[in-house]
């Protein structure tokens, strides 16, 4: 497939410098080594060259569409991308100033630079001396993760997917680096999270009042420990809860009245009970039968 047709399908047909640089990288790849040894086909090689060229010119590249066109999984594509990039000796760089200008967050530049330097110091201090020399902090994912965390801390909206596409990494690797930075440099990147009670927020409280089933457990626990308060306190209660309390009070009044009436109608257990004698008047025919039976 021709490079220009692949670029048009990826939405890069209007960027002539990107297409020219990708064609140059493809020729360099053919001269330097055989990409088939790495398991990279011709179409995938052209797509990776386009992505490297797009990252070099700071042009947005649709990686999801590129993975779909290559016919590979995301992990296999990233592995092939890194192998081809290392084979060509090309390293993508991501400047903090360019990110600040592109996303409209110029005031974050000093915070990002401070956080990156602090993360490097603390990360290297935690590593053994034998591994410190091989650690590479020049990868764009560190700059992008630092920029994203600073924007999140200062409550600025930044497109995370756009950042991931710019740094040329996967979402899982970006999340891993972001978590590591937030853990090591919580004073620079961390965000204090406090779980607020839903009843303390006015909007949530009104929403819960509309859905009585959501407050069932709260009503049961509150009604067991609450006593009858003032009229002002009752007015402050939500509508559903106020009706519930009125129904409970009416039920208690009815229950007490029933119990008191039962006590009044109940006989006194101290008095002895006497069985009444039943004297029925006998008919003359019954008396004649008794006399005849006695005579026999």
UniProtKB/Swiss-Prot annotation:
Entry GO terms, CC: nuclear origin of replication recognition complex
Disulfide bond found in the keyword field: no
Localization per Swiss-Prot or TrEMBL: Nucleus
Keywords of the record: DNA replication, DNA-binding, Nucleus
Biased composition (Polar residues): 254-264
Highest taxon above the source species: Eukaryota
Region (Disordered): 212-296
Primary role: Component of the origin recognition complex (ORC) that binds origins of replication. DNA-binding is ATP-dependent. The specific DNA sequences that define origins of replication have not been identified yet. ORC is required to assemble the pre-replication complex necessary to initiate DNA replication.
Family of the protein in this entry: Belongs to the ORC6 family.
Subunit structure of this chain's protein: Component of the origin recognition complex (ORC) composed of at least ORC1, ORC2, ORC3, ORC4, ORC5 and ORC6. ORC is regulated in a cell-cycle and development dependent manner. It is sequentially assembled at the exit from anaphase of mitosis and disassembled as cells enter S phase.
UniProt-recorded name of the protein: Origin of replication complex subunit 6
Organism: Oryza sativa subsp. indica (Rice)
